[in-house]
């Protein structure tokens, strides 16, 4: 029996014309189907830590740069509007 072509009829679903199956003696349910939620809390903790560990630099470095820029800007603004910084404020605003 060759590969199916337009002129070859293999049969309907379940009756494909092949040899009968033999030797199936038992049926089992997959262990994944029996315990679908096994280990979710353990895996959630360690997977969350792994994800955090691999991503925290992508957040921490830009946040640190922004915080440094914001802190220096506030200090400079407080200096400009103090008694000691009035002269520089007049020079900057020209």
UniProtKB/Swiss-Prot annotation:
Residues 2-49 are mitochondrial matrix. It is a single-pass membrane protein. The chain crosses the membrane at residues 50-80. Pfam families: UcrQ (PF02939). One of its GO terms (molecular function) is ubiquinol-cytochrome-c reductase activity. Residues 81-94 are mitochondrial intermembrane. GO terms for cellular component: mitochondrial inner membrane; mitochondrion; respiratory chain complex III. Keywords: Electron transport, Membrane, Mitochondrion, Mitochondrion inner membrane, Respiratory chain, Transmembrane, Transmembrane helix, Transport. Component of the ubiquinol-cytochrome c oxidoreductase (cytochrome b-c1 complex, complex III, CIII), a multisubunit enzyme composed of 10 subunits. The complex is composed of 3 respiratory subunits cytochrome b (COB), cytochrome c1 (CYT1) and Rieske protein (RIP1), 2 core protein subunits COR1 and QCR2, and 5 low-molecular weight protein subunits QCR6, QCR7, QCR8, QCR9 and QCR10. Present with 6140 molecules/cell in log phase SD medium. PANTHER family: CYTOCHROME B-C1 COMPLEX SUBUNIT 8, UBIQUINOL-CYTOCHROME C REDUCTASE COMPLEX UBIQUINONE-BINDING PROTEIN QP-C. This is Cytochrome b-c1 complex subunit 8, mitochondrial. It comes from Saccharomyces cerevisiae (strain ATCC 204508 / S288c). The lineage of its organism: Eukaryota, Fungi, Dikarya, Ascomycota, Saccharomycotina. The gene is QCR8.
